Amino acid sequence: MRHIISVLLENESGALSRVAGLFSARSFNIESLSVAPSEDLTASRMTIVTSGNDAVIEQIVKQLDKLVDVIEVSEITSSDHIEREIVFVKIKDSDTENENLKSLKTNEFLKIHKAE
């Protein structure tokens, strides 16, 4: 089953590498990973999407909580949350392709930006 784990960690060099190393050493798979500064500039929020049964996820959470840079770990799959994904695609610019892209823009969640 797919699970989302939120990790608040100190904004220090090597913190991401320690988290990735934990997953690698225990053969856990990271399906998706996102890291950004939190509201406290000394900390970062890491969001990890992984899969496994409840016992595996419980083990991952316990192991993450033991890491030196980790402040807080929470499994948020069953909590209320908003999910979004982003994709960057580079395409050749032409009038025909621009018209095709405009026709794809079917709702406010799809935003197309033209690089200058």
Sequence positions of predicted segments:
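A conserved regulatory-domain signal marking ACT and ACT-like small-molecule sensing domains
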Residues: 1-116
